[in-house]
């Protein structure tokens, strides 16, 4: 692979990754915000601490049922108006892998097995990672400043 092909591949990777982030940021934020709003309601009903309740609900994210995962995935496709989300995820995985392969194998032609997650699985993984980060810093969602 010559240096121009690599540069083009790097540009494509950056663009696909930027597009994917742009598509996911607001819908994922809205999803986490809805978890916080549910925590507020639950905390009022049970007289528990809102942030502890928020953390409790966030900790359930990795264990979401397939129906919940698919519902969130479909919601994200609708609100982001991105019916090509699965293709975008695939493009990001392929571009990243091609760059890593070009660096690792130099001029050798070697077949690489690439497991690309489904769109729903990828979105659930993003939710899980975001939930972990917000669990560590729940004050980011407080409304009482």
Residues covered by each model-derived region:
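Extended alpha-helical interaction segments
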Residues: 1-114
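Alpha-helical bundle/repeat cores within regulatory domains of eukaryotic proteins
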Residues: 108-145
């Amino acid at each position: 692979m010559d240096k121009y092909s690599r540069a083009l591949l790097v540009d494509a990777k950056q663009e696909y990754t930027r597009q994917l982030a742009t598509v996911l940021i607001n819908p994922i934020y809205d999803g986490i915000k809805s978890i916080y709003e549910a925590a507020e309601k639950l905390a009022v009903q049970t007289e528990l601490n809102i942030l502890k309740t928020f953390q409790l609900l966030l900790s359930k994210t990795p264990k979401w049922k397939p129906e919940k995962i698919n519902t969130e995935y479909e919601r994200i496709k609708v609100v982001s108006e991105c019916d090509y989300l699965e293709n975008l995820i695939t493009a990001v995985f392929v571009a990243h892998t091609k760059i890593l392969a070009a660096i690792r194998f130099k001029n050798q032609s070697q077949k690489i097995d690439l497991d690309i997650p489904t769109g729903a699985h990828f979105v659930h993984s993003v939710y899980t990672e975001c939930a972990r980060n917000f669990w560590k810093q729940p004050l980011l969602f407080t409304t009482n400043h």
